Amino acid sequence: MNWKFSVAVCLTLGWQSVFGLEIIEVTVDVEDGRYRVFGQSRIEATPEFVYAVLMDYDNFHKLAGGIAESKFLPNDESGNMMAYTRFESCVLFFCKTLEKVERVVGQPTNSIQVEAIPDLSDFAFNESSWKIERSAGKTLLTFEAEFDPDFWVPPLIGTWAIRNKLLNSAESIGMRIEWMQAKGLTLAQVSE
């Protein structure tokens, strides 16, 4: 069955938090079981600070709800950085714990590329990227991901849930980063 469901949130007036966070766009598309997500926001923090926070896998679980555990693993045989993430999430009556082992490649202050290892993850395919750009004295943060879950996702509820989770995560991550930058804290110094 081939179906596509797309949700776009483009807030033309520019939704803003009390911190200055602006959520620009959030979209979720699914076709033939493969999800594509896109999120973009503008954050009142330097690109260097945003990059450092996003690369702190040992403390990444402190950024947003649903991430139960995150940590760096030993590098793989080629010397690539490896990380582990465990997510716990419920949508209505459907609850799932997901694990992901991934290769992490960072280009300091510019971008982070992440690729899950299917044999060690609950995803048949999962690639994501963070693009970090200076923009009008703030940081433009763009998140893109494409994934094939290795488990059943309720069709209409799943897309809605992923979109809501992405929007809530963008807000939570952005506000936490802005707060830490304003207070001069690293992610390691923040309590859970």
Residues covered by each model-derived region:
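Hydrophobic pocket/interface hotspot
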Residues: 50-51, 60, 104, 141-143
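Hydrophobic/aromatic beta-strand elements that line small-molecule binding cavities or substrate pockets
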Residues: 38-41, 70-72, 98-105, 127-134
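Bacterial N-terminal signal peptides that target proteins for export
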Residues: 1-7
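Hydrophobic ligand-binding cavity/cleft-lining segments
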Residues: 18-78, 168, 191-192
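Beta-strand elements of well-folded, non-transmembrane domains
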Residues: 43-47, 87-91, 106-108, 120-122, ...
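Glycine-rich portal/gate segments that line the openings of hydrophobic small-molecule binding cavities
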Residues: 31, 71-120, 171-183, 187-192
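Beta-strand/loop substructures that line and gate deep hydrophobic ligand-binding cavities in soluble
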Residues: 117-168
